[in-house]
Design a protein with these regions (language model features):
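Intracellular helix-loop hinge segments at the cytoplasmic ends of transmembrane helices
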Residues: 44, 136-147
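Conserved extracellular-gate-facing transmembrane-helix segments in secondary transporters
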Residues: 30-42
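Juxtamembrane intracellular "pre-TM" segments in multi-pass secondary transporters
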Residues: 2-33, 48
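Helix-to-loop junctions at the C-terminal end of transmembrane segments
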Residues: 70-89
Length: 157
């Protein structure tokens, strides 16, 4: 393991770029939402509400991760189609966050209206996962686009 020769002060971690700092804050909430849904909420729901066994929940989540990876791998092509060949901009990430918020609200509405829990939660979160994977790719692209080359490792990390 290689250790850094110079320790970075906390104040140096924040970028001088407003765009990088805003995107970093957005990424914190983006990944926090993913963890709440997929690390806590979905496994508990599948087990407690649908009566799935530990093995069924684990198998489902394993398939979920594989599917998420597939969407991530296809994200450049999907985004290229959605953007008509253009490159993602800050507004693209904002739109993705808005769609994620709408999907979350629709899932809550579906549960509140006593619609089928399986359809409402699992299918709703499948759409959430698809949009999340695309938005995560946009964030990854933007952080590199906004970063000066000598600060890339610090900003991406």
């Amino acid at each position: 393991m290689v250790l850094a020769k110079v320790k970075v002060k906390f104040s140096q971690i924040l970028s001088k770029s407003r765009e990088v700092n805003l995107l970093s804050a957005a990424r914190m909430f983006l990944f926090g939402s993913r963890d709440i849904w997929f690390v806590v909420g979905l496994p508990v729901f599948l087990s407690a509400s649908l009566g799935w066994s530990h093995a069924e929940v684990g198998g489902f989540l394993a398939l979920w991760v594989i599917g998420y990876g597939g969407v991530q791998a296809l994200a450049p092509k999907l985004l290229d189609r959605c953007l008509g060949g253009g490159t993602p901009r800050g507004g693209t990430a904002t739109l993705g966050a808005f769609v994620l918020a709408i999907l979350t609200g629709l899932i809550a509405l579906g549960v509140g209206l006593d619609l089928s829990p399986w359809v409402t939660v699992v299918c709703g979160l499948a759409l959430f996962g698809l949009v999340f994977a695309l938005n995560s790719s946009v964030h990854s692209y933007l952080i590199l686009a906004y970063t000066e080359s000598e600060q890339a490792a610090l900003n991406v990390g």
